[in-house]
């Protein structure tokens, strides 16, 4: 390798000061610029997941749509905006209702979109059960959540840029706010 090992890496290989916090679906993690450390708060009401001032509030839901232990989906809220990060998860044909509820009215849903429906259900080499979603599943979930924008994310490595551009163009007719995420991609939500 040109630059050495890049994946997977050990936590000791990360050149940074890290603060690791475990949170559950019944807690939020609050980052406040006036506090040196994030703190956990138990969710007692819907008000507990709404940021106050310049707080950043991180909440999560457990999705069992991947492997044996599932995967965590995160919502990051700041002021009156939020985004939901749902990767490494296999949604459902017809939308993931639990995720749609968690992501309702989100400004940006970043959703695993590894396969086309054709590749996912291929009679020769099906991908169902691999723990990844299709573009259609992402759109169905975004529509059910009434998300404003949808970032397709985590593509099959065999898909080249031209194929991804064609996929994006095709799905824009079904969900106007969809786009392909890419390295360095930035989206302004404020």
Question: What do the PLM-derived regions correspond to, one by one?
Answer:
Residues 90-183:
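Cap/insert and terminal regions of metallo-dependent hydrolase folds
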């Amino acid at each position: 390798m040109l630059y050495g090992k890049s994946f997977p890496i050990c936590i000791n290989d990360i050149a940074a000061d890290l603060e690791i916090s475990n949170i559950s679906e019944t807690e939020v993690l609050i980052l406040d610029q006036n506090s040196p450390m994030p703190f956990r708060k138990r969710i007692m009401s819907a008000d507990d997941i709404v940021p106050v001032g310049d707080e950043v509030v991180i909440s999560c839901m457990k999705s069992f749509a991947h492997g044996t232990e599932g995967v965590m989906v995160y919502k990051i809220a700041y002021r009156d905006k939020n985004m939901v990060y749902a990767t490494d998860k296999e949604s459902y044909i017809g939308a993931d209702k639990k995720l749609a509820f968690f992501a309702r009215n989100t400004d940006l849903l970043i959703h695993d979109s590894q396969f086309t429906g054709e590749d996912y259900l291929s009679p020769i080499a099906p991908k169902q059960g691999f723990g990844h979603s299709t573009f259609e599943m992402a759109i169905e979930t975004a529509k059910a959540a009434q998300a404003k924008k949808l970032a397709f994310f985590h593509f099959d490595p065999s898909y080249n840029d031209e194929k991804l551009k064609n996929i994006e163009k095709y799905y824009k007719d079904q969900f106007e706010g969809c786009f392909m995420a890419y390295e360095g991609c930035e989206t302004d939500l404020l």
